[in-house]
């Protein structure tokens, strides 16, 4: 019983699907997918529950969301363990993700009041009141890299605003989603307010195309996001929020503390085995002896990175990629770059057949004429040597993406120069570019998103503004308009 529809756990009626621990091939979860008919049942359940959920009022909805927060707190160790088993991420990282899910509640409440609350003011025309109302039924598509935190970041603000949800998680991390719904159930969520449909592409297509959803919130690949964007282009009545990753640049310029710079490069490129949408994919290093010395330190540090299963002790920095297929894809990406003329500085290797375990790679692509503008979603960092700062910024902007970017530089003037010219939604200075604040918006431009930033700004796409001019009684104006007599 792995689908949650109208407050009941039911069996999927589609084909069998299995979730496997990518570090050891252990079966974590096995069930059947939701059919298109079951997707329709889930949407109908959400539709039937939506008005009552909205009319419960913010305080009533908040009480249930806070009860869910308490369930997360009580079960955070289990949540972290399930995330680790399904994704292959080390336990120190998944404990952080479980904690972020708890923290998201307070941030979402603050965002609701600041971004979409109610306000009023007196005007000559009457009392002007601004309110916000929910869209209705929204679909949430979750990714595999943060299977708890990222969908949680859509679901919580959507519910606070008064929407109901149909949640389709990644088929690679279904057990995390199942645990989330069990905690919502324990929190006393009314039937139909969240519905879970587990499945693969056909389940997602059925949900995305359903005529009775009012919006879709998506985190995932640029390819899928662009398909959804085209699909929704002819339906302006539906809200579409896309977060789609990037080919993110990091520039190094005149840094005295090279050890700290190496640390921030590693944290930017290799955390989560390179499977964060904000991970650095391109590293720009000055030509000459200073850049050579930095790269020498970086190569030595990369070779010391510990890689291992999610439960290894002592804990590794990098766990497994999400699957053996993903690991092989990174080996192939490296091969393609080498065939284009790149030079390997640290080879990315598939450590163990049958697993997603790979070692981190560093590859010099300076001078490669037709460098692919691709998001290689794994621990492979491309190095480009540059002659002057303007060249580095120009190269950094040579991408259709625009999610995150950063510069490590001791000069504030260099940062200001970079900030004014770089095109990205997240721009960091002397910090890893995988670091983002939940109290700030999170999103990119270009192929990285559609101007629907998430995190603190998720409240914006979960409700629409309703502007009213009000008076307590009907009254005649002091002076009638010309040509009128009453």
Curated annotation (Swiss-Prot):
Pathway(s) the chain acts in: Amino-acid degradation; L-arginine degradation via AST pathway; L-glutamate and succinate from L-arginine: step 4/5
Annotated GO biological process: arginine catabolic process to glutamate; arginine catabolic process to succinate
UniProt-listed CDD domains: ALDH_SGSD_AstD (cd07095)
InterPro entries with a match to the protein in the record: Ald_DH/histidinol_DH, Ald_DH_C, Ald_DH_CS_CYS, Ald_DH_CS_GLU, Ald_DH_N, Aldehyde_DH_dom, SuccinylGlu_semiald_DH_AstD
Superkingdom classification of source: Bacteria
Residue numbers annotated as active site: 243, 277
Membrane-crossing segments per the record: none
Binding-site residues, NAD(+): 220-225
The keyword NAD appears for this protein: yes
Pfam short name (any one): Aldedh
Enzyme Commission number, as recorded: 1.2.1.71
Catalysed reaction, written as an equation: N-succinyl-L-glutamate 5-semialdehyde + NAD(+) + H2O = N-succinyl-L-glutamate + NADH + 2 H(+)
Family under the similarity heading: Belongs to the aldehyde dehydrogenase family. AstD subfamily.
Function: Catalyzes the NAD-dependent reduction of succinylglutamate semialdehyde into succinylglutamate.
Protein name (Swiss-Prot/TrEMBL): N-succinylglutamate 5-semialdehyde dehydrogenase
Organism from which the protein derives: Shewanella halifaxensis (strain HAW-EB4)
Designated gene of the protein: astD
């Amino acid at each position: 019983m792995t689908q949650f529809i109208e407050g009941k756990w039911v069996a999927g009626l589609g084909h069998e699907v299995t979730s496997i621990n990518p570090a050891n091939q252990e079966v974590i979860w096995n069930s059947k997918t939701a059919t298109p008919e079951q997707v329709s049942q889930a949407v109908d359940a959400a539709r039937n529950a939506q008005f009552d959920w909205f009319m419960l009022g913010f305080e009533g909805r908040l009480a249930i969301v806070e009860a869910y927060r308490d369930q997360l707190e009580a079960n955070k160790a289990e949540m972290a363990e399930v995330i680790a088993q399904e994704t292959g991420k080390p336990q120190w990282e998944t404990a952080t993700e479980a904690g972020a899910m708890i923290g998201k509640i307070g941030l979402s409440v603050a965002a609701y009041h600041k971004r979409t609350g109610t306000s009023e003011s007196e005007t000559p025309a009457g009392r002007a009141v601004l309110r916000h109302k929910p869209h209705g039924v929204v679909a949430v598509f979750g990714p595999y890299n943060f299977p708890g935190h990222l969908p949680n970041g859509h679901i919580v603000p959507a519910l606070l605003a008064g929407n109901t949800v149909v949640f389709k998680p990644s088929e690679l991390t279904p057990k995390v989603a199942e645990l989330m719904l069990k905690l919502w159930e324990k929190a006393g969520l009314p039937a139909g307010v969240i519905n879970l449909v587990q499945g693969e592409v056909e389940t997602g297509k059925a949900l995305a195309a359903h005529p009775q959803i009012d919006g879709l919130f998506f985190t995932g690949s640029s390819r899928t996001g662009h398909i959804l964007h085209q699909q929704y282009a002819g339906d302006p009545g539906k809200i579409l929020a896309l977060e789609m990753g990037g080919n993110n640049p990091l520039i190094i310029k005149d840094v005295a503390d090279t050890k700290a710079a190496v640390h921030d490069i590693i944290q930017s490129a290799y955390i989560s085995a390179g499977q964060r949408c904000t991970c650095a994919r391109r590293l720009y290093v000055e030509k000459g002896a200073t850049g050579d010395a930095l790269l020498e330190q970086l190569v030595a540090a990369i070779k010391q990175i510990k890689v291992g299963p999610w439960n290894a002790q002592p804990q590794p920095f990098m766990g497994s990629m999400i699957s053996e297929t993903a690991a092989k894809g990174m080996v192939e990406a490296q091969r393609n770059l080498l065939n284009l003329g790149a030079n390997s500085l640290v080879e990315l290797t598939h450590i163990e057949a049958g697993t997603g375990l790979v070692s981190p790679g560093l590859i010099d692509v300076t001078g490669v004429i037709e460098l692919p503008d691709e998001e290689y979603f794994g621990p492979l960092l491309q190095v480009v040597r540059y002659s002057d700062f303007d060249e580095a910024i120009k190269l950094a902007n040579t991408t259709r993406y625009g999610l995150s970017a950063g510069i490590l530089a001791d000069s504030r003037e260099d940062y200001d120069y970079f900030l004014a010219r770089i095109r990205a939604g997240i721009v960091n200075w002397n910090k890893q570019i995988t670091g983002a604040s939940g109290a700030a918006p999170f999103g990119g431009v270009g192929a990285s998103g559609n101007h629907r930033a998430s995190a603190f700004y998720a409240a914006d796409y979960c409700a629409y503004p309703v502007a009213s001019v009000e008076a307590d009684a009907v009254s005649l104006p002091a002076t009638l308009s010309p040509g009128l007599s009453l």
